[in-house]
Amino acid sequence: MYFAIEGVIGVGKTTLARLLQPRLDTNLLLEVFEENPFLSNFYSDRARYAFQTQIFFLLSRYYQQNRNVPAMLEQNKHLISDYTFEKDALFASINLHGDELEMYYRVHEALAEKMIPPSLIVYLRASIDTLMQRITLRDRPYERNMERGYIAELNQAYDDFFLSNSRKTPVLVIDSNQLDFVHNSQDLDWIENRVRQVLQMAPFQPELPIDARSPEHAD
C-alpha cells in the first residue's frame, strides 16, 4: 500500500510523514527539493525562472519516484511519501504560460504514464494566514520572499485539484488549522486513526472521537 501526503507549501507534509512513518511501520519517501538551483531565484523573480524551476522539479520528481517507489513497494512494506508526482502539473499551471506550458504538459504526460499512483492521498488543508505563519516559523532562506498572493493562488489551486469529484484516487481531507500534530500527541493519534480507517489498517480505534476541530471527508 502506497499513500501520499499533499498540501500547500508550509502546511506540514514532511513533518507529518516523518511522524506517521514509525507509527505505521512504513517505508518513507521524502521529496528532495533543496537541490533545485533555480528555486531561490524563482521566489524572487517568478516570471524569469519559472520554466527552469518547473522542468527541474518535473525531472527530479520523475527520477525519484520512478526509481524509489517500485523498489520500496517490493520490500513488502507500506510506503508513505510527502508528495505526489501529479502535483507538479498543478504548479506548472500557475507558473507557466503559452508555449512553455504546452511544452511542459507534453513532457509531463509522457512521464506520468510510467508512475505508480498512490492508493490514498491525505490532503492537509490550512488557511492562508496559517500557511504564512508556518512558513515564517520554519524560516527557510529561499522562502523569505514568499508572496502572500502566491500562497493564496496555490491554496485555491490545491482545493480545486484535490477536492474534485472526478478524481480516481481517494482523498482524505484534513483541516489542519486547529491541529498541532507536532506537539499534541492526541492530534497525531487522531490523524493516524483516520488514515488507518481509510486504508483499513489494523489497529483502527473506532472509539477515537472525530470532533469538530478537523472536518474531513474522503472523495
PLM feature segments, named:
Residues 49, 53-116:
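Glycine-rich phosphate-binding loop used to anchor ATP phosphates in small-molecule kinases
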Residues 13:
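Conserved lysine of the Walker
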Residues 136-146, 150-219:
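NTP-dependent small-molecule kinase module
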Residues 5:
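Hydrophobic anchor at the beta1->P-loop junction of P-loop NTPases
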Residues 16-17:
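Post-Walker A alpha-helix
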Residues 8:
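P-loop (Walker A) phosphate-binding loop of NTP-binding proteins
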Residues 88-157:
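A glycine- and Lys/Arg-enriched "phosphate-lid" helix/loop adjacent to the NTP-binding pocket
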Residues 22-60:
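Conserved substrate/cofactor phosphate-moiety recognition/catalytic segment
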